[in-house]
Amino acid sequence: KRSLRDLGIPVNQIIPEGGSLKYLKDLPRAWFNIVPYREVGLMTAIFLEKKYGMPYVSVTPMGILDTAEFIAQMEKLVNAWASVLSKEKVNYISYIKNQTQFV
């Protein structure tokens, strides 16, 4: 959650944490889904991708390499939306370096 905030990526919902039936209708509003643990949520992400065309990131951000890959995949998806929304593309390389340099 902190990394997403640092990168300027707004969070629609965190399921199942704090999730309720009232807010499930808002799931399709997300630009993409994050599945940090494949054991929990992967089937939902696959369903949402098939039904609504919502891509997902399923890399567990543990360790230097996987954290860098996780952020790089999010950068790709955010930049895909940037072109649709006429916004400037993002570059998370400096964030990746900062997060992995002193480990």
From Swiss-Prot:
It comes from the Eukaryota. Its EC number is 1.3.7.7. Its main location: plastid. Pathway: Porphyrin-containing compound metabolism; chlorophyll biosynthesis (light-independent). GO terms for cellular component: chloroplast. Disulfide bonds: none annotated. It is found in: Plastid, Chloroplast. Binds 1 [4Fe-4S] cluster per heterodimer. The cluster is bound at the heterodimer interface by residues from both subunits. It catalyses: chlorophyllide a + oxidized 2[4Fe-4S]-[ferredoxin] + 2 ADP + 2 phosphate = protochlorophyllide a + reduced 2[4Fe-4S]-[ferredoxin] + 2 ATP + 2 H2O. The keyword ATP-binding applies. Belongs to the ChlB/BchB/BchZ family. Component of the dark-operative protochlorophyllide reductase (DPOR) that uses Mg-ATP and reduced ferredoxin to reduce ring D of protochlorophyllide (Pchlide) to form chlorophyllide a (Chlide). This reaction is light-independent. The NB-protein (ChlN-ChlB) is the catalytic component of the complex. Protochlorophyllide reductase is composed of three subunits; ChlL, ChlN and ChlB. Forms a heterotetramer of two ChlB and two ChlN subunits. This is Light-independent protochlorophyllide reductase subunit B. It comes from Cibotium schiedei.
